[in-house]
Amino acid sequence: MKIDYLTLFPEMFDGVLNHSIMKRAQENNKLQINTVNFRDYAINKHNQVDDYPYGGGQGMVLKPEPVFNAMEDLDVTEQARVILMCPQGEPFSHQKAVELSKADHIVFICGHYEGYDERIRTHLVTDEISMGDYVLTGGELPAMTMTDAIVRLIPGVLGNEQSHQDDSFSDGLLEFPQYTRPREFKGLTVPDVLLSGNHANIDAWRHEQKLIRTYNKRPDLIEKYPLTNADKQILERYKIGLKKG
């Protein structure tokens, strides 16, 4: 996969992209990273990339010329995903990360002002994505967050391919509780079932815990999850237990 970042602050990406999984993915030729400062593509002597909005209003708006000119240098095909980071976009999700992990080329357009000239949005962008109902100073941090979520799903990037399949959201539920040594710590013990060696019982316990944890922390996900009759019975028993105290 190749990822290009159009940004006014390419140095922001150095730390994140050169460590841990990102670094290994590049070393193993699974990922090619390129940052482009689109200020270099400004058309006047002052390297101006923003201007006041037509019609008045607060803040500055990114001009179209630098972004369009930078895109022309990237050899972007029709198959590439060009992502605009913006609060009005589609909320980012695990499902979106899975979809984007299959792309060969992704371009992130990272703004840093009040907004974008609408012509950038309508003529260059394939996906508008938001990280949530809040506003950040720029698109760089969301782009880095998305990159981490996407790249770890590329086959061969993680040492253990099973790892991401057990992650929260991979099957629509939150992850089950995890324990490691010691068996007892400050009077807190590991559930006996995890020490039993019975893998069927362990799997059943983990699924039950995923259902309960999701029910408590993300009821919106439970509403979307295709509950089996057995799942419904698990949750009903849990609710009855809560009422009994």
From Swiss-Prot:
Organism: Staphylococcus aureus (strain MRSA252)
Subcellular location as annotated: Cytoplasm
Pfam families, per the entry: tRNA_m1G_MT
Taxonomic superkingdom: Bacteria
Protein keywords: Cytoplasm, Methyltransferase, S-adenosyl-L-methionine, Transferase, tRNA processing
UniProt xrefs under HAMAP family: TrmD
Catalytic activity: guanosine(37) in tRNA + S-adenosyl-L-methionine = N(1)-methylguanosine(37) in tRNA + S-adenosyl-L-homocysteine + H(+)
Residues that, per the record, bind S-adenosyl-L-methionine: G111, M131, G132, D133, Y134, V135, L136
PANTHER family assigned: TRNA (GUANINE-N(1)-)-METHYLTRANSFERASE
A single GO cellular-component term on record: cytosol
EC numbers on record: 2.1.1.228
Family per similarity comment: Belongs to the RNA methyltransferase TrmD family.
Subunit structure comment from the entry: Homodimer.
CDD domains the UniProt entry points to: TrmD-like
Protein name in UniProt: tRNA (guanine-N(1)-)-methyltransferase
GO biological process: tRNA N1-guanine methylation
Job description of the protein: Specifically methylates guanosine-37 in various tRNAs.
GO molecular function, one term: tRNA (guanine(37)-N1)-methyltransferase activity
Gene3D superfamilies: 3.40.1280.10, tRNA(m1g37)methyltransferase, domain 2 (1.10.1270.20)
